[in-house]
Amino acid sequence: MEVEQTSVRSDTNSTCEYLDAEGDPESPNLYQEADPDQEAEQQNHSIISELRDGLGTMRDNSALSPEPGQENKGLAASVESLALSTSTSAKTEDSIGGGLEEEYDYQHDSLWQGQKKHIFILSEAGKPIFSLHGNEDKLATLFGVIQALVSFVQMGQDAITSIHAGGIKFAFMQRSSLILVAASRSNMSVQQLQLQLGDVYNQILSILTYSHMTKIFERRKNFDLRRLLSGSERLFYNLLANDSSSAKVSNNIFTFLTNSIRVFPLPTTIRSQITSAIQSNCSKIKNLVFAVLIANNKLIALVRMKKYSIHPADLRLIFNLVECSESFKSSENWSPICLPKFDMNGYLHAHVSYLADDCQACLLLLSVDRDAFFTLAEAKAKITEKLRKSHCLEAINEELQQPFNAKLYQQVVGIPELRHFLYKPKSTAQLLCPMLRHPYKSLTELERLEAIYCDLLHRIHNSSRPLKLIYEMKEREVVLAWATGTYELYAIFEPVVDKATVIKYVDKLIKWIEKEYDVYFIRNHATF
């Protein structure tokens, strides 16, 4: 059993690689923690309030101390209890019928033992908020153990970050009256699990805002936050269904692991026409902060107000919202959304709609003006009309039907032994990731590929001993990780390829990416 503690720190999910990055700044470690003073300042300052003031718009805005010498015994007992509980205590939603749930004994559910990952969210008072598997109320004992563990460590003016026990990694994150825990049997490192917890925390803030949630817990520490999150459970389940533990074959795991987003591949001329259409119809709308056009969980175009940028973590929340909301396809919607990395204390008001019935690209116009719906609806109609006349809708549809990513292997001519790769420029937070193909299209093989990338990313971004180059000949593949001053490349080759051939192929791949760069990446984002 191994327990890791650390002094109280800030968000491990922070990065300075923003989506409008220009040039090639020195890139921080992927898991680098935020400056506590900077985060505290952000919590007390609202960018949205500042924008509204500038634009002239209106806004409404104890644990008992143990006996001497008993702390370590109590902590060890709690750790043992937590490891035991997460091996035998809960069930999946599908394992028992809803009618029997009230009488079911979670403490003896062997079906849950096969789960590879759990996420638990509770308040500092120990009140259950969310469990990825099982009913929170039926897991009260487990939540109590978690709260006891955190309290033991807090009494020493410290914070617990991870526990390794019973073949399970437990990653902890404490944020603004909340305790978030990931329990995993996968190959993910503690830092990678904390990245995922950071996304979950941001999802909560996107619904409630930091200031509102803080006021609630200041008034009532044992408040049941599920009352305010009711109806949004689908957002959490979908957000967490991004790796093989969800029994889905998907590329989403790679954007989460690299703290990035993917760009919708388009010819440069088409993307420029799309951006121009948004600019020309939105430039005079003073209250508009961001215009985001997405399709298939990828960014087509982003236009922003000068001085303001959007973080990849915030964009992933937008992608998640659109993916989970079928109603957006049938009508125009007006939704408040908090983008925590932009401003954790206030809402932007989003006009959300698909461009047309015959084009499944979704446009979000985010404003600080809560009364701008009709103005933005008119702008959206004009944008759609202009894109139809310039045949941009046809270009988007063609890519949706015959994805560039599916043709990546054919386009990279002469590298038949290349199985898969990830490429991330350090000047952006964007990722090039081809579609999965044989042998990684099955869930079992995806788990293996996921484990390989988790290991490579952890070693490249290890805070104590980061590596620049990794080359390994494994039994079933040859793997390469290479971090230069301008990009990161992770590549998987057939096991028969030797080192000289890998070097030749990597050189060829990099040259091809540089040639096609503007199809798969957005260098700079336009402004209003």
Swiss-Prot record:
Keywords: Cytoplasm, Guanine-nucleotide releasing factor, Lipid-binding, Transport. The Rab7 guanyl-nucleotide exchange factor (GEF) activity of the Mon1-Ccz1 complex is autoinhibited by the N-terminal disordered region of Mon1. GEF activity is stimulated by Rab5-mediated recruitment to membranes. It is found in: Cytoplasm, Cytosol. Residues 1-16 have a biased composition (Polar residues). InterPro entries: FUZ/MON1/HPS1_longin_1 (IPR043972), FUZ/MON1/HPS1_longin_2 (IPR043971), FUZ/MON1/HPS1_longin_3 (IPR043970), Mon1 (IPR004353). GO terms for molecular function: guanyl nucleotide exchange factor inhibitor activity; guanyl-nucleotide exchange factor activity; lipid binding. Transmembrane segments: none annotated. Residues 1-50 are annotated as: Disordered. One of its GO terms (biological process) is endosome to lysosome transport via multivesicular body sorting pathway. The keyword Transport applies. One of its GO terms (cellular component) is synaptic cleft. Disruption phenotype: Accumulation of autophagosomes and reduced number of autolysosomes in fat cells caused by disruption of Rab7 recruitment to autophagosomes leading to a defect in autophagosome-autolysosome fusion. Impaired lysosomal degradation of endocytosed Notch and Boss receptors in the developing eye. Belongs to the MON1/SAND family. Component of the Mon1-Ccz1 guanyl-nucleotide exchange factor complex made up of Mon1, Ccz1 and Bulli; the interaction of Bulli with the Mon1-Ccz1 heterodimer is mediated via the C-terminal Mic1 domain of Bulli. Mon1 and Ccz1 form a stable complex which displays Rab7 GEF activity with or without Bulli; GEF activity is enhanced by Bulli possibly by improving membrane association of the complex. Interacts with Rab5 and Rab7; preferentially binds GTP-bound Rab5 and GDP-bound Rab7. PANTHER family: SAND PROTEIN-RELATED, VACUOLAR FUSION PROTEIN MON1 HOMOLOG. The disordered N-terminal is involved in autoinhibition of the Mon1-Ccz1 complex guanyl-nucleotide exchange factor activity. Part of the Mon1-Ccz1 guanyl-nucleotide exchange factor complex specific for Rab7 that promotes the exchange of GDP to GTP, converting Rab7 from an inactive GDP-bound form into an active GTP-bound form. Plays an important role in membrane trafficking through the secretory apparatus. Required for recruitment of Rab7 to endosomal and autophagosomal membranes to mediate endolysosomal and autolysosomal vesicle maturation. Required for fusion of multivesicular bodies and lysosomes but not their formation or trafficking. This is Vacuolar fusion protein MON1 homolog. It comes from Drosophila melanogaster (Fruit fly). The gene is Mon1.
